């Protein structure tokens, strides 16, 4: 990236940030967790700034301060949602720690000793609110995180809010980039201090903040070797194995070299998270409930003419495909690692 985004940050994003946050200090440094690695700022720009368009075109992150993408949803809070979101089921994760490490339940059979660190249940929205309020009243370590794709069970007012999103702007972005279809809008409601550990997605993402503030730390695809993802067949595929709170440098020595790109997003901000970029997301400490909606798009189709050398994200895709093919050919995901070690040791390292 990194030069381009860093240059933009140095040349003007600070002014945009001051302007966007002029009403008052919405958060302070005491609400951010401390980590061992350095970070650089992600640019904060107007959607009309040509530099913002350049960053998105180059698949580099940027915070857009004035898209009005989810303007009708800025009034959303727990009370409004409880009254209007309908009687569908919502996926709610509970954990005894602040970290919500994603896992794919369909892959749990590949690793018999795997134990998820959070539990998922399907409940009504009012049940989620009741559980949340009970936890807040009694205190303790238990935490909740609602993660649900918006679907046709929502009530009329939510539908009207959804139709009022700035689809004109985001559809133009989709068209200009040649992206595939919008695959989902994921609603995220988290407790203060919740953390989604570093992971990457295989889709383009406009991350729209609605309520509260979230800290977002991103890492480009070329830092793959610093972040040590789980194997493709593991339930935590695409997630980093490194515990950011207490890194094990003996197991993960390259983590010493990692450098993040950081921002804090508040209501109305939209963060572009490029496909294959790692992202670590945390609701600020003592910041109250956070509400976010993701806009996930399939990436652009592979060009007919491949340009060399390949980009970092293309190499990540190749590595994923190799792991998948070996798992299928061997008939046992547990044999993939030993075979790769046999291929590489003493020959390529």
UniProtKB/Swiss-Prot annotation:
Modified residues (N-acetylalanine): 2
Chief localisation class: nucleus
Residues reported to bind 2-oxoglutarate: 145, 196, 205, 214, 294
Record PROSITE patterns: JMJC (PS51184)
Compartments, as annotated in UniProt: Nucleus; Cytoplasm; Cytoplasm, Perinuclear region
Region of interest (Interaction with VHL), residue spans: 2-125
SMART domains documented for this protein: JmjC
Region of interest (Disordered), ranges: 1-51
Top-level EC class: oxidoreductase
Compositional bias of kind Low complexity: 1-14
Keywords, sorted A to Z: Acetylation, Cytoplasm, Dioxygenase, Iron, Metal-binding, Nucleus, Oxidoreductase, Transcription, Transcription regulation
Chain positions recorded as Fe cation binding sites: 199, 201, 279
Binding site for substrate: 152, 181-183, 201-203, 238-239, 300, 321
Quaternary data: Homodimer; homodimerization is essential for catalytic activity. Interacts with VHL and HIF1A. Part of a complex with VHL, HIF1A and HDAC1 or HDAC2 or HDAC3. Interacts with NFKB1 and NFKBIA. Interacts with NOTCH1, NOTCH2 and NOTCH3 but not with NOTCH4. Interacts with ABPA3. Interacts with TNKS2. Interacts with PPP1R12A. Interacts with UBE3A. Interacts with ASB4. Interacts with ANKS3. Interacts with NECAB3; the interaction is indirect and seems to be mediated by APBA3.
Job description of the protein: Hydroxylates HIF-1 alpha at 'Asn-799' in the C-terminal transactivation domain (CAD). Functions as an oxygen sensor and, under normoxic conditions, the hydroxylation prevents interaction of HIF-1 with transcriptional coactivators including Cbp/p300-interacting transactivator. Involved in transcriptional repression through interaction with HIF1A, VHL and histone deacetylases. Hydroxylates specific Asn residues within ankyrin repeat domains (ARD) of NFKB1, NFKBIA, NOTCH1, ASB4, PPP1R12A and several other ARD-containing proteins.
Annotated protein name in UniProt: Hypoxia-inducible factor 1-alpha inhibitor
Species, as recorded: Mus musculus (Mouse)
């Amino acid at each position: 990236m990194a030069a381009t985004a860093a240059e933009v940050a140095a040349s003007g994003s600070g002014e945009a940030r001051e302007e966007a946050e002029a009403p008052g200090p919405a958060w302070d440094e005491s609400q951010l967790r401390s980590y061992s690695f350095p970070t650089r700022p992600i640019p904060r720009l107007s959607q009309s700034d040509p530099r913002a368009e350049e960053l998105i075109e180059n698949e580099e992150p940027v915070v857009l301060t004035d898209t009005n993408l989810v303007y009708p949803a800025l009034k959303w809070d727990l009370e409004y949602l409880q009254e209007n979101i309908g009687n569908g089921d919502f996926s709610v994760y509970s954990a005894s720690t602040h970290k919500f490490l994603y896992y794919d339940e369909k892959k749990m059979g590949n690793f018999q000793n795997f134990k998820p660190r959070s539990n998922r249940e399907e409940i009504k929205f009012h049940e989620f609110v009741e559980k949340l309020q009970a936890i807040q009243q009694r205190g303790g370590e238990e935490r909740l995180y609602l993660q649900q794709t918006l679907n046709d069970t929502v009530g009329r007012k939510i539908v009207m809010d959804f139709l009022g999103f700035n689809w004109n702007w985001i559809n133009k972005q989709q068209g200009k980039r040649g992206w595939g279809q919008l695959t989902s809008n994921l609603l995220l409601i988290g407790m203060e201090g919740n953390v989604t550990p570093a992971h990457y997605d295989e889709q383009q993402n406009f991350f729209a903040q609605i309520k509260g503030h979230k800290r977002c730390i991103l890492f480009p695809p070329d830092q793959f070797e610093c972040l040590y993802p789980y194997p493709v067949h593991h339930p935590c595929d695409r997630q980093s194995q490194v515990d950011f709170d207490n890194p094990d440098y003996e197991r993960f020595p390259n983590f010493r070299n990692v450098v993040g790109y950081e921002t804090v997003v508040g209501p109305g901000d939209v963060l572009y998270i490029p496909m294959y970029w790692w992202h670590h997301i945390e609701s600020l400490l003592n910041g109250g409930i956070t509400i976010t909606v993701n806009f996930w798009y399939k990436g652009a189709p592979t060009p007919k003419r491949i340009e060399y050398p390949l980009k970092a994200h293309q190499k990540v895709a190749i590595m994923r495909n190799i792991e998948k093919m070996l798992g299928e050919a061997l008939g046992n995901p547990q044999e993939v690692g030993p075979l790769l070690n046999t291929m590489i040791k003493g020959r390529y390292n």
